[in-house]
Structure formats: structure tokens, C-alpha cells
């Protein structure tokens, strides 16, 4: 059984309208799974503007860290809107020089994220941005990378949280804000 997409800030009319663009794809990536596709929402100019505004709203930060891949798109837009810089947290093999690397477990395997050298500095307040929070492994690794540079995780913000997967429990010490839940 699936739950409908819910907007957490019901007073945000633009975000409510944007949430209607989230597409449900049954049996993807495997039978029995209901995939929530936010791509149509990000492809719509008004919806994207509402998402970007909501992702950065109410957070005090010096720089944004966007998680590969859609976290790059969202993070860059949030950073531009707030006049800050943006750092891309990358999958392995994409950077010429790596400051830090975090390996983490996924439901079926493992993965890694890397922080580019010369980007984050000690004491910076970092807003971590990603598209979807599922099991929490990736977001937890992103927060570990930020801390490994001596920076502070000011908050983490995602477009969609899949609450049944319990990802929020992997980052209990982080101020986590989701725009939508399902």
C-alpha cells in the first residue's frame, strides 16, 4: 500500500501546486514498487521556483552542498538564490583531487561519496541538499563528509521523503526538512 504525496507546508500554495506534478510509476524499478518521479516537477519553471524557494527557506547557511546528481541541480539553484557558493558531493572517480571520502552501505550493496579538495572550510555552516530521502544512507554520508572538513551541517533539506523507508532515523542529529512526503 502506498501513501499519497503530502505537502508539509500546507500554507505554501505554490508548493502545493508543484506537488501535483509528481508522477507515480508503478512497478519501477521492480514489481511492487511505486516510484515517485519528481522530474516533471523540476521541468516546470513555476514548480522549480517554488521548490528552490522552499528548500532554502528558514535556514542559516554559508554554503550549499548538493548530492550527486539531482542535488547538484537543486543545490546550485538554492545557492544562487541565497548568494552563497555550492559544492558538489561526488560519486567516486569524478574528481582530480579528493579532500575526504565516505563509504556507506545501501540496501543491496555499497556506495561512496567524495568531497572535492579546496571547497569546504572549517567553521562553515553548510546546507546539504538532495532530491529524495529514502533509506538515509546517502544523506548520512553527505553529512559525514561535511563534518570531515570541519564544517557544520546547518540543516539538510530534500524535496521528497519516503517515510516508510525510515531514512530520517539515519540522521537523528541533523535538522532535516522535507518539502513533500510519501
From Swiss-Prot:
Domain of life: Bacteria
Annotated compartments: Cytoplasm
UniProt keyword list: Cytoplasm, Glycosyltransferase, Purine salvage, Transferase
GO cellular component: cytoplasm
Enzyme Commission (EC) number: 2.4.2.7
Pfam family, one: Pribosyltran
Gene Ontology BP annotations: adenine salvage; AMP salvage; purine ribonucleoside salvage
Predominant cellular place of this UniProt entry's protein: cytoplasm
Catalyzed reactions per annotation: AMP + diphosphate = 5-phospho-alpha-D-ribose 1-diphosphate + adenine
Protein's pathway: Purine metabolism; AMP biosynthesis via salvage pathway; AMP from adenine: step 1/1
Keyword Transferase annotated: yes
Matching InterPro entries: Ade_phspho_trans, PRibTrfase_dom, PRTase-like, UPRTase/APRTase
Molecular function terms from GO: adenine binding; adenine phosphoribosyltransferase activity; AMP binding
Quaternary structure annotation from Swiss-Prot or TrEMBL: Homodimer.
Role description: Catalyzes a salvage reaction resulting in the formation of AMP, that is energically less costly than de novo synthesis.
Family in the record: Belongs to the purine/pyrimidine phosphoribosyltransferase family.
NCBIfam families in the record: PRK02304.1-5
Name of the featured protein: Adenine phosphoribosyltransferase
Organism per entry: Saccharopolyspora erythraea (strain ATCC 11635 / DSM 40517 / JCM 4748 / NBRC 13426 / NCIMB 8594 / NRRL 2338)
